[in-house]
Amino acid sequence: MTESNLGTESRTATIDNGAFGTRVITFSTGRLARQAAGSVVAQLGETVVLSATTVGRQPKEHFDFFPLTVDVEERMYAAGRIPGSFFRREGRPSEDAILTCRLIDRPLRPSFVKGLRNEVQVVETVLALDPSHPYDVVAINAASMSTKLSGLPFSGPIGATRMAHIDGSWVAFPTHEELVRATFDMVVAGRALPDGDVAIMMVEAEATAHTAKLVADGASAPTEEVVASGLEAAKPAIRELCRAQSELAEVAAKPVAEFPVFLDYSDDVYDAVTELAREDVAEALKIAGKADREEALDRIKARAVEELGPRFEGREKELSAALRSLTKSEVRSRVLREQVRIDGRGPRDIRPLTAEVGVLPRVHGSALFERGETQIMGVTTLNMLRMEQSLDTLSPEKSKRYMHNYNFPPYSTGETGRVGSPKRREIGHGALAERALIPVLPSREEFPYAIRQVSEALGSNGSTSMGSVCASTLGLLSAGVPLKAPVAGIAMGLISDEVEGKTRYVTLTDILGAEDAFGDMDFKVAGTQEFVTALQLDTKLDGIPSDVLAAALQQAYEARQTILEVMQAAIEAPATMSDYAPRVTTVKIPVDKIGMVIGPKGQTINAIQDETGAEISIEDDGTIYVGATNGPAAQAAVERINGIANPTLPKVGDRFLGTVVKTAAFGAFISLLPGRDGLLHISKVGDGKRVEKVEDFLNVGDKVEVEIADIDQRGKIYLDKVRPEGAEAPAEGAAERPAGRDRGDRGPRDRGDRGGRGPDRGDSGDGGDGGEGGESRPRRRTRRS
């Protein structure tokens, strides 16, 4: 299906990137998914996403939240692939799909009318994937467009663009190839205002894995000023996308339908609660401790229900909602008018900080980071690169070396709840903390380990995700990972309201859980002392002025420096690796020798692993990673591998302490180097004594010191036994016996044994066993007729 027949109506948005070319995003509707309330196909290059928005017929009156669901369906056929699962069918959503769901939900949710209780579902299906263009930002625009067409009370459209900082310029909708040269990658969503400006609604951004190298080579570091300029640079693209969506909506959107709106409470309930409890609530909000404060508020709630319940019978939920609204109002008013927060801090103050490393035995690295009542334990595990995570997604990345898992058990907030597989929130928080550390991780060549970082949220009262960033830095350094720089994170909040006829904004540093719930913004910023590594913005407003966000970035920078000082006091440099962590050694071999190291059916590599206790991983380019928990085991494995693939060829006269690997009637085979055996003939085994049977003197596994006596043209090695110093050498031929009486290795022959004829011929020293496998070379006779 080509661009021209994706719909009956279409509009395009054209974004000019100057030297980086133009990007054309097309919105088409009217042909696909016509039974949905609103459907659209969005296309960028050859990336095609179908978005369908549907709405439930009846409202869910018993819900006290807006039931919006966003699903992203990655179809492997979009990339011309068959799923790698057992059933060869797509299963549960990938992490990329879940993160894209969150990207769509965050700007979409605050754009619906307050009090809507009808179920709304937005389903994004990836129909085709251009290898150059990721689908996630296309899906955000598609979701906005299909929702705008559906007739729902929606304040969109919302435009979203990816911005990359490349060679000092901001590029909209960069390709995967261009992102390799980017120092910063940022997804920005917003809506166009009547005055022509753009209000920012959502930001998801990070420095790239190449940032540190690019900056070292002279590129601009993604400082707070650079990031703020990126928010401004995103506005023209967002404005153009909103224009195209609005034009399509004018000709194809359904009229906005009437939906019942369920307000949390009525004015009469709010007035009664305010009159009864305002002073008590104001006093309770001065309690710094979370548990004590919530206990005091619970007592106020119980009293309000008891005293006002008879008056508002059957409206207990309204009483609770009104009390929550009163609490929110008091929190915000105190901040705006007095510059004092719930726990008594000023807007820029940070809660008490503690950082400690090495808190757990046995593990490879561990740390405990606390910020007020937020407590995060970070645990680091190192392993061979073959333990990195394989990815079967539409992303061009096929594996992930650094894996960050975030766990948020219910006890972290003092509550009961479900424990099990991670929820979308946990996946999102883990991904954010992961992206914050990726720019400072050492390369595979510098540190050939797979790294798993687990953040355990043991206590939660504000920004466990940024606490996880700090705990991860400490844990990685504790494990001996040579980070390029330590990273810290901080969560910023925002309170805004009309004060004396003007909208006033107050940015809060290090927000509490209540400030997150009652505030207008959750703005998380992570970075080093030099630049920003990750940030995330969520807002409950229709948008935030970019100058307010720029000021918040600068305020976050100041807080980050304070946190980094505390962390560096706990650990300044990478610690010595744990005794329980594997030591990985890198060996480079010629590609054509990989088969020799592996051996038939893996026999050689398995034997090396079994005998040395090391783990071996082989890359396609001939790089071999050898891991072991102790140095001698790794060294032994490396020597075995080098002996096979990078051998030092032995020469006549070299001495070895070899191992008997096989015995035969004619002698013993001695292992000198991995893959290099030599023959010690039976005549050389007994130190001058008559030898009837090799096993009387040597058995498999015995160590014996030998010297190379000869190497024939085929590379076969013949050995002499090294006699102890002072021992007399046997007389010439003393150890030799007539071939006819002993027959050595000759065995039966078709022509009979010739040994009885004439005098004993014996061997002439070291040349009589030069045949394959050590057999004597038969003498050729010619019969004359």
From Swiss-Prot:
Domain KH: 582-641
Cofactor(s) required, per the database record: Mg(2+)
Residue span, S1 motif domain: 653-722
Biased composition, class Basic and acidic residues, residue ranges: 734-764
Region of interest called Disordered, as start-end residue ranges on this chain: 722-785
Catalytic activity: RNA(n+1) + phosphate = RNA(n) + a ribonucleoside 5'-diphosphate
Gene Ontology biological-process entries: mRNA catabolic process; RNA processing
Keyword field contains Transport: no
Alphabetical list of PROSITE patterns matching this protein: KH_TYPE_1, S1
Molecular functions (GO terms): 3'-5'-RNA exonuclease activity; magnesium ion binding; polyribonucleotide nucleotidyltransferase activity; RNA binding
Pfam families per record: KH_1, PNPase, RNase_PH, S1
Record-listed Mg(2+) binding positions: 516, 522
Intracellular or extracellular location(s): Cytoplasm
Keywords of the record: Cytoplasm, Magnesium, Metal-binding, Nucleotidyltransferase, RNA-binding, Transferase
Physiological role: Involved in mRNA degradation. Catalyzes the phosphorolysis of single-stranded polyribonucleotides processively in the 3'- to 5'-direction.
Family, as annotated: Belongs to the polyribonucleotide nucleotidyltransferase family.
Protein's name according to its UniProt entry: Polyribonucleotide nucleotidyltransferase
Gene: pnp
